[in-house]
């Protein structure tokens, strides 16, 4: 079957790889000159299935009000003037109760755990390199309340069979030795030994090269203007004066998927702006070993070979990609607070990207009401964590095979009332 994939971020390229391995003739289209040059370029670098959790959580509405007055707040909201943003935020608020949180986290962990297994299999099969580490993830708590709240998430981990350790502050250095110097600032941590880390952009670009060698065609520097539909099927992708045709089409444009599908399929995917720093390592014994998550500031600090990636925060501000100095200061503050000798912060590279987020935090993966239009988008802050599993799942569904995990609740059908955002003219094109 001929398949066109729209988008060459980590999700789009993973989809291309698994569809090619299933015997399909795959073409990937993207406006950028190469793979992983937008949202997949400089994310936090963590592959953390056990920490897969929606931003829509109990207590978040009240916290959001407090965060409005804090300098280093993990979440910020600025109205973009669209009804879609208001509807999206209302849907998110409706998911902030305990029952919805547990349901959403459960299916997110399910997909993320499966994805980690798919990544392991891919690594064993291809020996793909991406500065990966298998040292686990450590969530750090600065208050007793955070430590106590961890028991809620532990219940979900136990149900999913995810191993964990709940550590008091005196034991944190057993996992991350450099934290011995700052243990007095912390109340404890939750460690998940099976989690991994790695450079998402490096992985995506290497996988794209492998996919191309296996027969996948990449059409870079090719902005997409429109999906062409007739009745209940898509019959082409309009790119300038050219119409590219296939038997099936996969939407993996990330945050730009919603606007591109306007008038065809309503999906609840909105951009969640995040930031990162990439820092050269200064002192080896003062740097992280793997990944830590600062629960207070919602910031991850991840170790690559000779670099530290610091990423996090969430801004609900539309498609604004301005680099804001106060956000850089927050990232610098957290990494200096926890790893004061770890990196040359003054040499850091500052970056921002738009993560495609659904109100319930779970991506939309599967077929739409159009028989040949498929979705693989809405992974939020977990695109790297969920990419391989989502790609394999999509390949199985499109190929008529039974997936290895339950998948019905990942469909866009769970949003039965639909979303209809405006389509800004400047959003035409692919998203990576």
Curated annotation (Swiss-Prot):
Does Flavoprotein show up as a keyword for this record?
yes
Q: Pathway it acts in? A: Amino-acid degradation; D-alanine degradation; NH(3) and pyruvate from D-alanine: step 1/1
State the InterPro entries in the record.
DadA, FAD-dep_OxRdtase, FAD/NAD-bd_sf
Q: Which GO terms describe its biological process?
A: D-alanine catabolic process
Which key words are in the record?
Answer: FAD, Flavoprotein, Oxidoreductase
* Chain residues that bind FAD: 3-17
What GO MF terms are annotated? D-amino-acid dehydrogenase activity
What is this enzyme's EC? 1.4.99.-
> Which GO cellular component term is one of those annotated?
plasma membrane
What SUPFAM superfamilies does the database record attribute to this sequence? FAD-linked reductases, C-terminal domain (SSF54373), FAD/NAD(P)-binding domain (SSF51905)
Superkingdom to which the source organism belongs: Bacteria
| Reaction catalyzed | a D-alpha-amino acid + A + H2O = a 2-oxocarboxylate + AH2 + NH4(+)
Q: Which cofactor does it need?
A: FAD
Family designation: Belongs to the DadA oxidoreductase family.
What does this gene product do? Oxidative deamination of D-amino acids.
Task: Return the NCBIfam families for the record.
Answer: PRK00711.1
The name on file for this protein is D-amino acid dehydrogenase
